[in-house]
């Protein structure tokens, strides 16, 4: 080999090795551990539904226990409307904390909307295994309630003010502390 070839060959081999490594890394997509619609962390988004601009959200459904879930009956209190599904791990992880919030705060009510294709009797059985203190109603994934935007990911949580208007929307898992901060900020802004 000539001196110039002896310098070029190692450089060529090193570049080739780097290209092979880079190609391998791009080909290795991480396997999803949860469905793609589950968001990793909560973000807030401004409400952009007609209900937010037109006044109180109107929604009346039958809860899984057979009672009527009517958002109008919650006027005067802050309402957390949580879209969730049985297959959504972040949704299930936040349910006990939302249940505790519902029981602890008299000025905050929580309602759950199961955005799931599960059969209604299977949903009732699921809730017996994962009980919560707040009412749950099932909503159709094909025809979600017009009062809210179709969830782009789960969980999606709306905070309604005491007049029933959308105050805030959270995309992804939410904590009671985040809800309470939003309630406190909303209450302070109105006083």
Predicted regions and their residues:
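Sec-dependent bacterial lipoprotein signal peptides
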Residues: 1-22
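Bacterial signal peptide processing site
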Residues: 24-27, 89
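N-terminal "domain-start" segment that seeds a small globular fold
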Residues: 32-71
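Short active-site neighborhood of thiol/selenol oxidoreductases, capturing the structured segment around
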Residues: 70-92
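Alpha/beta-hydrolase fold active-site loops
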Residues: 78-79, 108, 155
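Structural microenvironment flanking redox-active thiols in thiol-disulfide oxidoreductases
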Residues: 92-130, 140-146
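Thiol/disulfide oxidoreductase modules built on the thioredoxin-like
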Residues: 125-133, 138-184
């Amino acid at each position: 080999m000539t001196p110039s070839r002896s310098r070029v060959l190692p450089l060529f081999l090193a570049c080739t090795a780097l290209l092979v490594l880079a190609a391998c890394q791009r080909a290795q997509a991480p396997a999803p551990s949860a469905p793609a619609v589950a968001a990793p962390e909560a973000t807030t988004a401004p409400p952009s539904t007609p209900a937010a601009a037109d006044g109180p959200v109107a929604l009346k459904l039958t809860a899984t226990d057979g009672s009527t879930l009517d958002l109008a009956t919650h006027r005067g209190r802050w309402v957390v409307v949580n879209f969730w599904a049985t297959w959504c791990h972040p949704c299930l992880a936040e349910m006990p904390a939302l249940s505790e919030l519902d029981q602890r705060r008299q000025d905050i009510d929580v309602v759950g909307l199961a955005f799931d294709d599960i059969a209604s009797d299977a949903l009732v059985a699921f809730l017996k295994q994962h009980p919560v203190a707040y009412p749950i109603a099932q909503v159709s994934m094909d025809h979600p309630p017009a009062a809210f935007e179709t969830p782009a990911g789960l969980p999606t949580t709306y905070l309604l003010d005491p007049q029933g208007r959308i105050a805030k929307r959270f995309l992804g898992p939410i904590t009671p502390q985040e809800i309470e901060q939003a309630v406190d900020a909303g209450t302070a802004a109105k006083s």
